[in-house]
From Swiss-Prot:
Single GO biological process annotation from the record: DNA replication
Identification of the protein by name: Single-stranded DNA-binding protein
Gene (name only): ssb
SUPFAM superfamilies: Nucleic acid-binding proteins
InterPro entries found in the cross-reference section: NA-bd_OB-fold, Primosome_PriB/ssb, ssDNA-bd
Pfam families noted in UniProt: SSB
Cellular component terms per the entry's GO annotation: nucleoid
Short sequence motif named Important for interaction with partner proteins, residue ranges: 172-177
Signal peptide: none
Disordered as annotated region, ranges: 118-177
Recorded GO MF terms: enzyme activator activity; single-stranded DNA binding
Quaternary structure note: Homotetramer.
Length: 177
């Protein structure tokens, strides 16, 4: 069977500005963000430390767009999985223009917020928020969506010891047949 190819982009970077969220006539949310990724290296000739930053346009749709608008801010670190798409549009003078961007939607799009609470505008500090673009992605069990509540500044929670499923002391191993 012939392969049709793979179109998958994975980015980990920081937002260059707050997300721009708008709503389509159908009511679906669309968020535009720009993500900066950087690499550093040492110039062999001069020994000087060099850095190169690449800017990526990312468009999120649906629930992901709403989450991005609510929780992401300039400087937030984020993990993105999506598809590379090029769209054609016309500027004010009628010239054809092209824009290439990472599109995050459908069953193959993922946004995970990284970093601590200070970066995420009140999100819990442990872990990120892994938000698949669509609940019940192919090949994954369906689970109810978790409600994320801000952490309260209270006494630390006490965790009980795990309970193991052990048979009672008088359990008889003899099989009755």
């Amino acid at each position: 069977m012939a392969s049709r190819g793979v179109n998958k982009v994975i980015l980990i970077g920081n937002l260059g500005q707050d997300p721009e969220v708008r709503y389509m006539p159908s009511g679906g949310a669309v968020a535009n963000i720009t993500i900066a990724t950087s690499e550093t290296w040492r110039d062999k000739a001069t020994g000087e430390q060099k850095e190169k930053t690449e800017w990526h346009r990312v468009t999120l749709y649906g629930k992901l767009a709403e989450v991005a608008g609510e929780y992401l801010r300039k400087g937030s670190q984020v993990y993105i999985e999506g598809q590379l798409q090029t769209r054609k549009w016309q500027d004010q003078s009628g010239q054809d223009r092209y824009s290439t961007e990472v599109v995050v939607q459908g069953y193959n799009g993922i946004m995970q917020m990284l970093g601590g609470r200070a970066q995420q505008g009140g999100m819990p500090a442990q872990g990120g928020m892994n938000v698949p673009a669509q609940q019940g992605s192919w090949g994954q069990p369906q689970q109810p969506a978790k409600q994320h509540q801000p952490m309260q500044q209270s006494a630390p929670q006490q965790y009980s010891q795990p309970q193991y499923n052990e048979p009672p002391m008088d359990f008889d191993d003899d099989i009755p047949f």
